[in-house]
A protein has these predicted regions:
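Short amphipathic alpha-helical segment that frequently serves as the phosphate-/nucleotide-binding helix
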Residues: 16-23, 202-206
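Residues at the starts of beta-strands that form the adenosine-phosphate
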Residues: 2, 35, 109, 162, ...
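Nucleotide-activated donor-dependent transferases that construct or modify glycoconjugates
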Residues: 1-15
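Conserved catalytic-core segment of nucleotide-activated headgroup transferases in glycan assembly
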Residues: 171-254, 264
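Short hydrophobic/aromatic-enriched beta-strand-loop microsegments
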Residues: 161-168
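Extended catalytic core of nucleotide-activated donor transferases of GT-like folds
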Residues: 7, 19-27, 32, 37-159, ...
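Catalytic binding pocket for nucleotide-activated donors in carbohydrate/polymer assembly enzymes
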Residues: 7-11, 21-24, 38-46, 50-57, ...
């Protein structure tokens, strides 16, 4: 089956936290025989910050971020059996969704893949005239990056036919333990781009914790933090490319995860960095959110903090031996329950079941039409 996938970027994680997620799922679907083309705009300087070159398991079409070129790639949706429009492309999102769904063949499966479902739901509720309201019923399904039961209920209440979370996971071929790298040596490392709806929580869980532990080393990676006030024990290293994530996660005594406001409110939304860090056998400290235990067991496979004071207390008491043990357990858990091979199997089964249902419906309708013709 051919898939036309319209998203932010497959080849660059620069200001694009969904890159690892896209790569893991699409790579596994390709292994299962899907023929996939990923369409991404040349926007936000991502192409000059590529983490990977176009892979052999997916065709990548990069188009200029103009309405004319967007319309050209939209027309190619007609070639696919499954058409996927992801959220957060960042350029002509509404026009892109309308265009690819209109261009899709009548027998094609139409999917909206929401990689920021809490924000999308909030926007739809705030704007009753949002164009997506009219389009939801025309979609065959909504797949989401996370969100669990609250997001499923929200989407179905807004008119979606089907909604299913496909959670982040680990690609063990990409993320795994490596030898420590001294440039990433620290007691607590945090890797994330600076975003408005996460900044307050970063201040609390990371910067506040650093102020409470002036004798400990804190390491901050990610784009946008240059002018953020930091205590003297916080070292900022800028954007960290995907190829260095394993060393970052394998070197720090502990690695912090901080959810965005919307994700923390909804819950059931582990970020890619959680599985990247677990894959490198890192000891993860996360802010508290509903559903953590569905992915890693608190206290044994991950440490959970309610605020910066909790983070500081956990780091102050954490020994290298305990950190290593928590990391080993986290790695074993994600290898057992949370790999992209398992997520790919979920998506594959969903696609096949849906298409079988559609074919059965077409046969029934054809049979009824034939019977009416005889009468």
């Amino acid at each position: 089956m051919k898939i036309a996938f319209y998203g932010s970027s497959l080849v660059s994680s620069y200001w694009n936290g969904a890159a690892t997620y896209y790569r893991g799922i699409i790579r596994d679907l390709a292994r299962r025989g899907y023929d996939i083309t990923f369409y991404e705009p040349d926007a936000y300087d991502r192409q000059s910050h590529r983490d990977i070159e176009p892979p052999d398991w997916c065709r990548v079409v990069v188009y200029p971020a103009t309405i004319e070129h967007m319309k050209r790639v939209v027309a190619r949706a007609a070639e696919a059996d499954i058409v996927v429009k992801a959220s957060g492309v960042g350029v002509f999102d509404n026009e892109l969704l309308d265009g690819v769904m209109a261009a899709a063949r009548p027998d094609a499966m139409r999917i909206f893949w929401d990689v920021d479902a809490p924000a999308t739901i909030a926007e739809l509720r705030e704007h009753p005239d949002h164009p997506m309201h009219a389009g939801l019923a025309d979609l065959d399904a909504v797949l989401t990056y996370g969100g669990g039961p609250p997001i499923v209920a929200a989407y179905e209440s807004l008119g979606a036919r089907h909604c299913r979370p496909i959670y982040n996971a680990l690609d063990p071929d990409t993320h795994h333990p490596v030898a420590p790298d001294e440039k990433f040596r620290c007691d607590l490392g945090f890797l994330a781009n600076r975003l408005p709806d996460r900044e307050r929580r970063v201040e609390e869980f990371f910067l506040n914790a650093a102020e409470q532990l002036p004798d400990r080393a804190f390491l901050l990676g990610g784009a946008g933090w240059e002018d953020k006030p930091k205590s003297s024990n916080v070292r900022y290293i800028g954007h960290v490319p995907t190829r260095d994530h394993n060393a970052f996660n394998s070197t720090a005594l502990a690695v912090l995860n901080v959810a965005r406001d919307s994700m923390a409110t909804i819950g059931y939304s582990p970020a890619t960095r959680v599985f990247e860090a677990a894959g490198a056998a890192a000891c993860i400290v996360t802010d508290a959110w509903e559903g953590v235990g569905l992915f890693l067991e608190p206290g044994k496979e991950i440490l959970v903090a309610r605020d910066g004071r909790d983070v500081a207390a956990l780091i102050a008491e954490l020994t290298p031996h305990r950190a290593a043990e928590i990391g080993r357990r986290a790695l074993a858990r994600v290898l057992r329950d949370h790999t992209y091979a398992q997520r790919g199997a979920e998506v594959d089964a969903f696609f096949r079941k849906f298409r079988e249902r559609g074919q059965m419906r077409e046969r029934r309708e054809a049979g009824r039409a034939g019977a009416e013709g005889v009468l």
